[in-house]
Amino acid sequence: MADSRATSFGAQAQDYEAGRPEYPFDAVAWMLEILPAGAQRVADVGAGTGKLTRAIAHAPGAQIVAIDPDPAMLAALRENVPGVPTFLGTAESLPLPDDSLDAVVLGQAWHWVDPVRASAEIGRAVRADGTLGLIWNIRDDSVDWVRDLSRIMHRSAAEEEL
């Protein structure tokens, strides 16, 4: 992700936190269930204000760390999910040692990364039998008001980036 876009969310961190939906419990639980036995050390990459971090932090035995390129988003995350270690970084440049993670997860963030570079970097940081988990919330366009909102959003230049 270009540096200017990577750090553009922080100015609106409070609005981002208020406006982004939480991740459904069942989806997060499923993602955690498929982790290798004994897996505990998980990095939430592109963690933002901590929506996914918060959900994983409550999992028994989880040792979550949060990584984001935007210092303001990490500041909001530290308020929202106290006690979680935070690091400046990206999926293409993880600030962690080789083979130090059991899993890397990205919530609504994979579309911001260079998938080839990110895959190689995640492969470096995750142990050989580790896991990459990707999760998104999607809009239910079968609901009239959601469909109308989607049409409005698709007129936005930001939505075209997705």
Place the predicted regions along the sequence by residue.
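Conserved alpha-helix/loop element of class I SAM-dependent methyltransferases that forms part
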Residues: 21-38
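Class I SAM-dependent methyltransferase Rossmann-like catalytic core
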Residues: 10-21
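N-terminal, positively charged/glycine-rich alpha-helical extensions of SAM-dependent methyltransferases
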Residues: 1-11
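Class I SAM-dependent methyltransferase SAM/SAH-binding core
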Residues: 41-43, 49-93
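A short SAM/SAH-binding and catalytic strip from SAM-dependent methyltransferases
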Residues: 102-116
